[in-house]
Amino acid sequence: MPRKKQTSPKEVTPALLKFREKRKWQINYRRYVLEESPCPFYAPYFGLDIKNLRQWFEYQFTGDLRWDNFGKKWQFDHVIPVTYFDFANEEELKMCWNFTNIRVEKFQLNKDRGNRLDVLNAKNYFKELLEKTNYAVCLKLLSKIDEIEVSDFVNTEAQQ
């Protein structure tokens, strides 16, 4: 019987590398929050220790949302989606994975938000948080939204 040919490994493209990097961060974030597993490398990017980060999410629980139904009834959601951040830039990583940029999102049927940024809601959210807390990361995230808006405007103009 002839040997089965091995399939060649996936070609390593910049997009694949970016996907793998994002996935690595997502996995470590879940381990940190859900499994309460300390991670000295990633923890500084999250902005809070495990106990306080879990409380941050618990404040957002509504109705029947609980830790034991993560992945079934709710998930973590980035206010500014991950795709807008450059993982090669340390400051961008700190903004992307900061607790203020991640919230509880209840699963909804037929919802397909994808990687779109709801600019108005995101701006209002970070402005309100900045006013209440004076937390500097909120100001940086507001600047990031402005940067995204300018970039989207330039791209739209270039297409016309």
Question: What residues fall within each predicted segment?
Answer:
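Contiguous alpha-helical segments
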Residues: 1-70, 75
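A generic "cationic amphipathic patch" detector
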Residues: 40, 70, 89, 115-119
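General structural signal for secondary-structure boundaries
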Residues: 48-49, 61, 91, 106-107, ...
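Histidine-centered catalytic micro-motifs used for acid/base chemistry in nuclease
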Residues: 56-90, 102-107
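Immediate flanking context of iron-sulfur cluster ligation sites
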Residues: 91-97
